[in-house]
Amino acid sequence: MKYMITSKGDEKSDLLRLNMIAGFGEYDMEYDDVEPEIVISIGGDGTFLSAFHQYEERLDEIAFIGIHTGHLGFYADWRPAEANKLVKLLAKGEYQKVSYPLLKTTVKYGIGKKEATYLALNELTVKSSGGPFVVDVVINDIHFERFRGDGLCMSTPSGTTAYNKSLGGALMHPSIEAMQLTEMASINNRVYRTIGSPLVFPKHHVVSLQPVNDKDFQISVDHLSILHRDVQEIRYEVSAKKIHFARFKSFPFWRRVHDSFIED
């Protein structure tokens, strides 16, 4: 079996990575960071997100595993003290694949510029580059509202536990193939109105943001933020692709939520 291990880069994570590579050396395991079948992330959720995007073109061939070396990582099932056990289990190849939905976003620009497509594990947020953020929200080609505020966040089910949660969005179980749109400081008065609530969209729904005035936006895909100019449309939909996790033990989603936000 081919595997690779990525580390947060701190001393604790780097040492654990080296120890695991040495442990895998005792089994029929090949280190391959080009075409791995297993990707192990050591660190926190930021490290995991980086690993996801590094291999997002090979998601169907990869199963991910997270080991948290700091605060509890939402995508990490394992602690450093369990690393030796994980090595032995992986060497046996006895694991189940659990899949989570992802978010696909297409950004369309003015004439002459090729559109860009992004895949998000947590969320994709859109904000103004400086001026007022005003966009028309269109759902399945039907105009829904004109939004004015700081920005909008579209999240995956697993991503609802991230930025979406801080915006007051609902938490969604990742078995639900859907996406959730939450507002960032919307303007609501006698003149301007928005729905003022998070919106959950099922698979096959398409949500479009169409600029009204300013067409330059700061778009963040998970942990990566880029300024996009001359944006004509931003289209969200549940991706046909999924991320796969290698699971060796039961760790129910709501137990994960409990341990992350209430108590460990």
Predicted stretch roles:
Residues A63, P157-S158:
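Proline-centered helix-kink/hinge sites
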Residues T47-F52, T161-K165:
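Short glycine/serine/threonine-rich phosphate/pyrophosphate-binding segments
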Residues M1-P36, L72-C153, T161-D264:
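Catalytic phosphate-donor-binding core of small-molecule kinases
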Residues G44-T47, G70, S158-T160:
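Short glycine-rich anion-binding loops that position phosphate/pyrophosphate groups of nucleotides
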